């Protein structure tokens, strides 16, 4: 049995703009989550071509310990809280698989994303068979809704309801911003359709851990896209060449950060 949810994130930017914004924000967010022996290590970041699909392949290792809840820490063997993330970014489609060497086939997280130029109204964009699609829970994430943000995660300078872009004049996003966006031909629009499939096979803990991970994915997607929008003035003028250069610099910086200082960024303490 697996748990599947589809998260839909609408944004006031174009699919083309988002490609740069997403990569910029991933690099920045990685630095905020790395330090004190924990965080993200980039092993590979290179172009790939397979079965007619072209894109960028990344292989990252997530070193976690304090970032998981106590009930997981208590049962996890020493050194087991290390996760491998492999991603194939054939934009506007992207596929990410997270695995753990200790749990082998008993655990995976699969995130498949389609980026579409609409307001999140398309059904079954991932082309699942009808029986599987019936079991999928659809979750709408509103980046301007503060009630969807954990109190510990809230930052006023990363709040789309308060932020206005100097370069694009987009924002602040009011309570009816999606309706206004639908009626505004001058402002681009898009939706990230993120299909998350989770398998965790461990007797007595399966549904607790699967639900915990889905809750964390929603938290990550919410915080990440709030940041992405509020950082728009930092990335809107960048090219893909700028991004690749920045990724190379970030890879070196992450190695330094991980080996020094204190643990940084998101903790699962509030979810225990």
UniProtKB/Swiss-Prot annotation:
Leader sequence segment:
none
Q: Which reactions is this enzyme annotated as catalysing? A: a 1,2-diacyl-sn-glycero-3-phosphocholine(in) = a 1,2-diacyl-sn-glycero-3-phosphocholine(out); a 1,2-diacyl-sn-glycero-3-phospho-(1D-myo-inositol)(in) = a 1,2-diacyl-sn-glycero-3-phospho-(1D-myo-inositol)(out); an N-(acyl)-sphingosylphosphocholine(in) = an N-(acyl)-sphingosylphosphocholine(out)
Q: Which residues carry this modification: N6-acetyllysine?
A: 215
Identify the domain of life.
Answer: Eukaryota
Compartments where located: Golgi apparatus; Golgi apparatus membrane; Endoplasmic reticulum membrane
One Gene Ontology cellular component: Golgi apparatus
Q: Which GO terms describe its molecular function?
A: phosphatidylcholine binding; phosphatidylcholine transporter activity; phosphatidylinositol binding; phosphatidylinositol transfer activity; sphingomyelin transfer activity
GO BP annotations of the record are: retrograde vesicle-mediated transport, Golgi to endoplasmic reticulum
**Keyword Ribonucleoprotein (UniProt):** no
Q: Per UniProt, which keywords does this protein have?
A: Acetylation, Endoplasmic reticulum, Golgi apparatus, Lipid transport, Lipid-binding, Membrane, Transport
- Report the protein's function: Catalyzes the transfer of phosphatidylinositol, phosphatidylcholine and sphingomyelin between membranes. Required for COPI-mediated retrograde transport from the Golgi to the endoplasmic reticulum; phosphatidylinositol and phosphatidylcholine transfer activity is essential for this function.
Which family does the record claim for this protein?
Belongs to the PtdIns transfer protein family. PI transfer class I subfamily.
What protein is this chain from? Answer: Phosphatidylinositol transfer protein beta isoform
Query: Which organism is the protein's source?
Result: Pongo abelii (Sumatran orangutan)
Q: Which gene encodes it?
A: PITPNB
């Amino acid at each position: 049995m697996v748990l599947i949810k589809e998260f839909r994130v609408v944004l006031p930017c174009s699919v083309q703009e988002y490609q740069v914004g997403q990569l910029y924000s991933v690099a920045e967010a990685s630095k905020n989550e790395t330090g004190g022996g924990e965080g993200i290590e980039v092993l590979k970041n290179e172009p790939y071509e397979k079965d007619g699909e072209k894109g960028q392949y990344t292989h990252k290792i997530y070193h976690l310990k304090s970032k998981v809840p106590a009930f997981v820490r208590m049962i996890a063997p020493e050194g087991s809280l290390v996760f491998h993330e492999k991603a194939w970014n054939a934009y506007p489609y992207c596929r990410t698989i997270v695995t753990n060497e200790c749990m082998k086939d008993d655990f995976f997280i699969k995130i498949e994303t389609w980026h579409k130029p609409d307001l999140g109204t398309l059904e079954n964009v991932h082309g699942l068979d009808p029986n599987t699609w019936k079991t999928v829970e659809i979750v709408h994430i509103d980046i301007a809704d503060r009630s969807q943000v954990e109190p510990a995660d809230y930052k006023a300078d990363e709040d789309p309801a308060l932020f206005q872009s100097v370069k694009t004049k987009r924002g602040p996003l009011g309570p009816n911003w999606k309706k206004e966006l639908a009626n505004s031909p001058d402002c681009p629009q898009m939706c990230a359709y993120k299909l998350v499939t989770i398998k965790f096979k461990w007797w007595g803990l399966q549904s607790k851990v699967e639900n915990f991970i889905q809750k964390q994915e929603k938290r990550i997607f919410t915080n990440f896209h709030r940041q992405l929008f509020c950082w728009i003035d930092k990335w809107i003028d960048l090219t893909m060449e700028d991004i690749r250069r920045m990724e190379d610099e970030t890879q070196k910086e992450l190695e330094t950060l991980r080996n020094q200082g204190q643990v940084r960024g998101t903790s699962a303490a509030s979810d225990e």
